Amino acid sequence: MSGGKYVDSEGHLYTVPIREQGNIYKPNNKAMADEVNEKQVYDAHTKEIDLVNRDPKHLNDDVVKIDFEDVIAEPEGTHSFDGIWKASFTTFTVTKYWFYRLLSTIFGIPMALIWGIYFAILSFLHIWAVVPCIKSFLIEIQCISRVYSIYVHTFCDPLFEAIGKIFSNIRISTQEEI
């Protein structure tokens, strides 16, 4: 950990949480790291943002990919004028595009702030409340499980073994009548 850097189990070189290199949009310069023969440095708080593929895990593939043809369709025999159809298509597409941009401009950062706070609280509760409660419960339940195991082996096992021996001597034979 000399110089404020450390290496993880996969061999990635990380910096300390303070952003000493780069910014949040391009934290590392891979070409420069290759030139100097250094490992690429990964910061736990920053990563390079892909501005082209903004849904790399395909979270919204089946939900928000709505096009004009998915919403409005004219069956055979009931067609409007071609100009109206083209204008409707253009109006729908442009309105959807710019209204989404307007909404994301107005509400994008506040919603990101709200969801960031929500997931920070969720992570905090999971790390500092849920996991310790579960571990505590598992430790405490071991005592009960030992007592329960002794009870089962002392009372239930002999009882069910005796019942099993009683019913094991029952024989059933079937006969077909002609």
From Swiss-Prot:
Location of cross-link Glycyl lysine isopeptide (Lys-Gly) (interchain with G-Cter in ubiquitin): K5, K26, K30, K39, K47, K57
Post-translational modification comment from the UniProt entry: Phosphorylated at Tyr-14 by ABL1 in response to oxidative stress. Ubiquitinated. Undergo monoubiquitination and multi- and/or polyubiquitination. Monoubiquitination of N-terminal lysines promotes integration in a ternary complex with UBXN6 and VCP which promotes oligomeric CAV1 targeting to lysosomes for degradation. Ubiquitinated by ZNRF1; leading to degradation and modulation of the TLR4-mediated immune response.
Topology, Cytoplasmic side: 2-104, 126-178
Residue numbers carrying Phosphoserine: S2, S9
Keywords (A to Z) from UniProt: Acetylation, Cell membrane, Golgi apparatus, Isopeptide bond, Lipoprotein, Membrane, Palmitate, Phosphoprotein, Ubl conjugation
Organism, scientific name: Rattus norvegicus
Modified residues (Phosphotyrosine): Y6, Y14, Y25
Lipid anchor positions (S-palmitoyl cysteine): C133, C143, C156
Location of N6-acetyllysine modifications: K5
Chain intervals for the UniProt region annotation (Interacts with SPRY1, SPRY2, SPRY3 and SPRY4): 131-142, 167-178
Record GO cellular component, one term: exocytic vesicle
Residue ranges of the region described as Interacts with SPRY1, SPRY2, and SPRY4: 149-160
One BP annotation, GO: positive regulation of ERAD pathway
PROSITE patterns: CAVEOLIN
GO MF entries: ATPase binding; enzyme binding; identical protein binding; inward rectifier potassium channel inhibitor activity; kinase binding; molecular adaptor activity; nitric-oxide synthase binding; nitric-oxide synthase inhibitor activity
Compartments where located: Golgi apparatus membrane; Cell membrane; Membrane, Caveola; Membrane raft
Family assignment from sequence similarity: Belongs to the caveolin family.
Interaction with CAVIN3 as annotated region, ranges: 82-94
N-acetylserine sites (modified residues): S2
S-S bonds: none
The protein, known as: Caveolin-1
Gene expressing this chain: Cav1
Lineage: Eukaryota, Metazoa, Chordata, Craniata, Vertebrata
Intramembrane feature ranges: 105-125
Tissue expr: Cortex and inner medulla of kidney (at protein level). Expressed in the hippocampus.
